[in-house]
Amino acid sequence: MSEKINLMDLTRQQMREFFKELGEKPFRADQLVKWIYHFGEDNFDNMTNINKKLREKLKQVAEIKAPEVAVEQRSSDGTIKWAMQVGDQQVETVYIPEADRATLCVSSQVGCALACTFCSTAQQGFNRNLTVSEIIGQVWRASKIIGNFGVTGIRPITNVVMMGMGEPLLNMANVVPAMEIMLDDFAYGLSKRRVTISTSGVVPALDKLPEMIDVALAISLHAPNDELRDEIVPINKKYNIKMLMDSVNRYLSVSNANHGKVTIEYVLLDHVNDGTEHAHQLADVLKNTPCKINLIPWNPFPEAPYAKSSNSRVDRFQKTLMEYGFTVTVRKTRGDDIDAACGQLAGDVIDRTKRTAQKKQFGQVIGVVNQ
């Protein structure tokens, strides 16, 4: 018997083709997508508006399978981090509630190949790309856990950011269909302004993105000059800052999802990239690119060669940029008591080691604390 097809690997259009091949009406795909994503259903028997004969046929050839939660950790600030089981490995998904929204940070790869020196995920190295079902399945599983707001009191997901483990633009074949499902009114129906793809600067893929999908864009810049960026974001050696910003401006010229602006992400590293001179250089780099700048206090991880910028250095950096007229925010660190903060996602390899050590110390698996 051939392997069953996971319907979570299919966009609604692909599912319509699947039903045609089964000799069924394409509208059945619309029904299935609604059942899977609107109602969180993964059991064909519970799909009451689909006749029993078709349900039995589907059970023979298809399945609905999302990653399972291996470990759940809840922060004192409401952030939840899940280690999701994907095959024999794990990736991490983070739920971040705020007063007016709730953002889900989703992984696109097991590990990451880009080797950014300040990021714990990069220290794990790259293992493989996630499939469509493993990406959209993170959203499905999180939505299932969060449940009904009226019952659980947990705010439903309003935004999805592809800012978890991995470089999304190195897995476009799976990331783009997953985002299509996020945007599909029959699935999650998120606005394209509420789905964000983040990249460290894979320029050829970024140039292709507008032909495939229109979503909000964030750029992990982190340095204002090529010499420094070559060191801390090594992909810059291949696609330098000018090449990247030219590509960003091309994307903005055709995108409707960004309000005409890109988000620039900038992790502040003490006495590395957080000086006033760096702020002036950054202002010069961004002067021709409509943007908002998100400054991110660095989140420490074991054996990292960096320190966190002081509040005074962060404030000075922000004020310098604001004097140029930029909109500049400082990201509030969320979930750092469970290593769910930006740059701390390391998945099974590192987390498992840390959890084991804590288990020996405290006799139970607890939220990971910064060392």
Swiss-Prot record:
It is found in: Cytoplasm. Residues 98-337 form the Radical SAM core domain. S-adenosyl-L-methionine binds at G166, E167, S198, S220, L221, H222, N299. [4Fe-4S] cluster binds at C112, C116, C119. Disulfide bonds join C105-C342. It comes from the Bacteria. This is Dual-specificity RNA methyltransferase RlmN.
